């Protein structure tokens, strides 16, 4: 009987936590940003620069069953402690005007990667994209991590 009571108390506590910004990491629960919104950085990575961590990934905020929107660009967050994440907006926005673009919301952008190239002094982003059942790649560059990113090569087959 005591075990059941403990589980019920834990369930009540977790329901309360879900309605607020978490004060600790809760495995298996939705991770929220500093505004209490669900973090949209699917298939993401973390980049560290100038005392800031950046968490970036696929933005699925507009994705819903049957609406044809697979992603809505790449969203990023900043943090000084790897726990409190501030939404910084879209790092790489979708190209909603051009249906043929690999960045169109109907394309499946997967696992963006960003590195800093010391030789060119550019930030380089590459992503695999599935478009019309074909795997392609896209490369973008920027002068600073926060963008703007410009496409330098797209539509080629990844290794």
Segments and roles (model prediction):
Residues 1-159:
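Carbohydrate-active catalytic/glycan-binding domains of CAZyme proteins
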């Amino acid at each position: 009987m005591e075990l059941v009571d403990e589980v019920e108390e834990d369930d009540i506590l977790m329901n309360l936590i879900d309605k607020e910004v978490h004060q600790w990491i809760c495995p298996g629960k939705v991770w929220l940003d500093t505004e209490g919104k669900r973090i949209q950085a699917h298939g993401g990575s973390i980049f560290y620069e100038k005392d800031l961590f950046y968490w970036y990934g696929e933005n699925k905020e507009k994705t819903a069953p049957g609406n044809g929107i697979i992603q809505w660009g790449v969203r990023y967050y900043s943090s000084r402690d790897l726990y409190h994440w501030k939404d910084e907006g879209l790092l790489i926005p979708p190209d909603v005007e051009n249906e043929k673009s690999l960045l169109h919301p109907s394309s499946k952008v997967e696992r963006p990667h960003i590195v800093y190239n010391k030789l060119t002094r550019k930030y380089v982003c590459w992503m695999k994209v599935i478009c019309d059942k074909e795997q392609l790649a896209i490369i973008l560059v920027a002068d600073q991590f926060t963008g703007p990113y410009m496409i330098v090569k797209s539509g080629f087959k990844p290794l």
